[in-house]
Curated annotation (Swiss-Prot):
It is a multi-pass membrane protein. Coiled coil: none annotated. The chain crosses the membrane at residues 3-23, 32-52, 70-90, 118-138, 161-181, 187-207, 214-234. The keyword Membrane applies. It comes from Danio rerio (Zebrafish). It holds the Pfam family Aph-1. Essential subunit of the gamma-secretase complex, an endoprotease complex that catalyzes the intramembrane cleavage of integral proteins such as Notch receptors. It may represent a stabilizing cofactor for the presenilin homodimer that promotes the formation of a stable complex. Belongs to the APH-1 family. GO terms for cellular component: endoplasmic reticulum; gamma-secretase complex. It comes from the Eukaryota. It is found in: Membrane. This is Gamma-secretase subunit Aph-1b.
């Protein structure tokens, strides 16, 4: 049973993201490189926030429950702000790199657009964030032990998997909206991305009341998905044509001779 829980939660958490990687990124070496670089930037932000957290915990009063809870909130907020700061830094780096690629290219168009870079880097952020948030939980799911034996929630593992899935997809959508906001200098949109990231992270404080964190998180996920779709140039008409297989440009672009 523990093996079934492990694989089930793993596929829930990482299945959609791995599918996106395999179908849209894996065949393009340049996209793979940018995805790995995005994951590295997220990892550096985690390293810095962990360092600050370690220092503050050492100098704090460990016997004060109120102070420790305040430090936990501070750590979450600091981590989110550092992640978004590194997302902006990665945007600036990609902007310079794209200009360099254009200068070296023999064509008049960029080898990869900023919208594609936003999607790829966001997925890189999401992969690394999801891995660090759920790997230890998945390891514990293999046993030994019985979930909920001491009266705790029996939905701990599956709830964690669905939260990880939401975080991975949200990072992808946040990346698209964030980069588009930087391109168009819409600072209110940047603020909305940071605010929604803070809200989602702080919602985890209501656990183990998982319905109190999962439901609002997936509502935010739905809103950000629509926003990212519009930022990527999508429309209701395009969606309808794609679903009904009437978008001739899309079909021709994806046609492969047999």
């Amino acid at each position: 049973m523990t093996v079934a829980v492990f694989f089930g939660c793993t596929f829930i958490a990482f299945g959609p993201a791995i599918a996106l990687f395999m179908f849209t990124i894996a065949r393009d070496p340049l996209r793979v490189i940018f995805l790995i670089a995005g994951a590295f930037f997220w990892l550096v932000s985690l390293l810095l926030s962990s360092l600050v957290w370690f220092i503050t915990v050492q100098i704090s009063n460990k016997n004060s429950a109120t102070q420790q809870r305040g430090l936990l909130i501070f750590g979450v907020v600091l981590s989110v702000l550092l992640q978004e700061a590194f997302r902006y830094g990665y945007y600036r780096l990609l902007k310079k790199a794209n200009e360099g690629l254009l200068a070296l290219s023999q064509e008049d168009t960029m080898p990869i657009s900023m919208r594609q870079l936003a999607y790829v880097s966001g997925l890189g952020f999401g992969f690394m964030s999801g891995a660090f948030s759920v790997v230890n939980i998945l390891s514990d799911s293999l046993g030994p032990g019985t979930v909920g034996i001491h009266g705790e929630s029996q939905h701990y593992f599956i709830s964690s998997a669905f939260m990880t899935l939401a975080i991975i997809l949200l990072h992808m959508f946040w990346g698209v909206v964030f980069f588009e906001a930087c391109e168009r200098q819409r600072w209110w949109a940047l603020g909305a991305v940071v605010a929604s990231h803070l809200v989602v992270s702080c919602l985890t404080f209501v656990n183990p009341h998982y319905q109190g964190s999962l439901i609002p998180t997936y509502i935010i996920l739905s809103v950000m998905a629509v926003w990212a779709y519009l930022c990527a140039g999508g429309s209701l008409r395009n969606l309808k044509l794609c679903l009904t297989c009437k978008d001739k440009d899309f079909l021709l672009a994806n046609h492969r001779p047999r």
